[in-house]
Swiss-Prot record:
It comes from Conus parius (Cone snail). The presence of a 'disulfide through disulfide knot' structurally defines this protein as a knottin. This is Conotoxin pr6a. Keywords: Disulfide bond, Knottin, Neurotoxin, Secreted, Toxin. Disulfide bonds join C2-C20, C9-C24, C19-C28. It is found in: Secreted. The keyword Secreted applies.
Amino acid sequence: TCLARDELCGASFLSNFLCCDGLCLLICV
């Protein structure tokens, strides 16, 4: 499942990028 960064991680400076599965969580932490 792919979610926009702002959906999964809150509004970050990369919010216009997409991240899939746990990758976004790893980037955000």
